[in-house]
Structures are given as structure tokens and as C-alpha cells.
């Protein structure tokens, strides 16, 4: 009888561990499938890369490498599956790639993109400082062509005093290839907001007009606070687990 009770207890513990593991894994699956679908769709439909190249370089880590991905070039969608979960991302002109979370794909595809007035900008940057370009050539070669610093860089571009002094791209890519910027977008956004502040188009020290914040202390948070990451809001940006940033981006 004692042995039977012990066996039952062991089985119960193992079942509890199995159920707990499945529940935890299920909570991660929207992130796993969402990450794969969104990033593969952006790489294929925005950057013009091949599926196999993206899966071998960009998606070859953690659970992401085990997703099964289907690219539908006619519908311009990517569906990624992992075990019993799946996610679909759709490319739309102007909008780029969007994860489908609820709703109908046809409704999302039919949503119009509001075109803004075109702004004239220089098509190309001017080159300058040949001596500096010459000094950077060995670095560009080692980084992009020889992969001497680990990883697989897609592009190496250096600006100095507004002039282009170094430019090298991975095979199959050039200055027209659109690439995922990750946190580099923060620098671009800060620069654009700085231009708007200079031209009195925005007051970065005014409280942000977010309706959900008006009933508590968050109503005092300014755009400057947000841009300098000093808002005081609790935020977990660990990309390795079920964090705030992963839930925001991929769930």
C-alpha cells in the first residue's frame, strides 16, 4: 500500500510538472510564432530576401528555429506554426507588415493607407574625406566580407560630418535594401522630434495627451520623459522571456 501511494505521488508530481510545462510553453507560443511570422514577412516582402536565407540567419535561435513557416507570395502573408499554435503576418503597401491578431485577414488587407504629401529630399548622400574612407576600408572588408568580428553583418555605413565615408553591403543587398533597424529607430525618431521642436511644431516638455493616463500620476509624463526613458513606468525589455516588450511586439 505504501509503495502504491508513493507511486501515485510520483505520478501526480510528474503530471503536474508536465501540465505546468505545457501551460508555460503555451504562453510563449504566441511570441514564438509571432516573432517568426512577422520577421520573416518583413524580410521577404520589405527587404526582398529569400525565405531560406532568413530562416538560416535571422530565425535560427531558441524555439524560433523550430517553427514551420509558409510564405504565400500571392496573398503576401507568412504563417508560422509551432506545435499546436500558429501566427499569420500580412504585408500591406504603405503599412509594411502587421501581425493578424483577431479580426479577418480580408478586412486588414482592405484597410486603406493614408498617403502623406511627398517631401523632396536628396536622393543620395555626398561622399567626403577620401583619407578616412581609405582607413575604414580594411574594417569594412573584415566586418562584411570576411565576418572577422563574428555574426553576419548586412551593411556597414559610416557618416562623418554629414558626408558618407564608408559603405559596404552583404552580397545581394545595396543602398536600396530596407533593413530592420531595431533600436536604431530610436535615434532617428529623436532626431526627427528634435527638428520638430526646433521648428516649434511640438513641445516635448508638455504632458502627453494619452486618455488612459489622465486619471492617475501618469498624466504628468512628458514626451521628453518618454524619449529619455525616464518616465518611471515599470517595463521589462528582456527579449529572452515572456516580457512586456515581447508581449507588446509579438502576442
Regions found by a protein language model. Name each.
Residues 81-148:
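Non-catalytic propeptide/linker segments at domain boundaries
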Residues 79-80, 137-173:
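A short, well-structured edge-of-sheet supersecondary motif
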Residues 27-49:
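Alpha-helical transmembrane signal-anchor/signal-peptide segments
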Residues 231, 235-251:
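A small/polar active-site loop signature that marks catalytic segments
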Residues 161-162, 179-205, 226:
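Active-site SXXK
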Residues 1-27:
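N-terminal Sec-pathway targeting helices
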Residues 198-234, 238:
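Active-site helix/loop module of the DD-peptidase/beta-lactamase fold
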Residues 34, 46-94, 102:
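Membrane-embedded, hydrophobic transmembrane alpha-helices
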Amino acid at each position: 500500500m505504501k509503495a502504491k501511494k508513493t507511486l501515485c505521488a510520483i505520478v501526480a508530481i510528474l503530471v503536474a510538472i508536465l501540465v505546468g510545462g505545457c501551460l508555460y510553453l503555451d504562453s510563449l507560443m504566441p511570441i514564438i510564432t509571432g516573432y517568426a511570422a512577422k520577421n520573416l514577412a518583413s524580410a521577404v516582402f520589405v527587404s526582398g530576401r529569400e525565405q531560406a536565407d532568413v530562416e538560416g540567419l535571422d530565425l535560427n535561435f531558441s524555439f524560433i528555429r523550430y517553427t514551420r513557416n509558409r510564405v504565400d507570395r500571392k496573398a503576401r502573408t507568412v504563417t508560422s506554426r509551432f506545435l499546436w499554435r500558429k501566427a499569420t503576418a500580412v504585408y500591406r503597401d504603405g503599412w509594411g507588415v502587421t501581425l493578424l491578431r483577431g479580426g479577418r485577414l480580408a478586412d486588414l488587407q482592405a484597410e486603406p493607407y493614408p498617403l502623406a504629401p511627398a517631401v523632396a529630399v536628396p536622393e543620395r548622400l555626398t561622399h567626403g574625406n577620401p583619407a578616412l574612407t581609405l582607413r575604414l576600408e580594411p574594417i569594412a572588408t573584415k566586418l562584411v566580407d570576411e565576418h572577422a568580428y563574428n555574426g553576419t553583418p548586412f551593411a556597414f555605413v559610416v557618416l562623418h560630418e554629414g558626408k558618407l565615408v564608408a559603405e559596404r553591403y552583404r552580397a545581394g543587398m545595396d543602398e536600396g535594401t530596407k533593413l530592420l533597424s531595431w533600436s536604431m529607430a530610436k535615434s532617428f525618431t529623436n532626431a526627427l522630434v528634435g527638428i520638430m521642436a526646433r521648428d516649434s511644431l511640438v513641445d516635448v516638455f508638455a504632458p502627453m495627451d494619452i486618455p488612459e493616463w489622465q486619471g492617475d500620476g501618469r498624466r504628468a509624463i512628458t514626451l521628453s520623459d518618454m524619449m529619455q526613458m525616464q518616465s518611471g513606468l515599470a517595463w521589462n525589455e528582456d527579449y529572452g522571456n515572456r516580457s512586456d516588450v515581447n508581449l507588446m511586439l509579438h502576442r
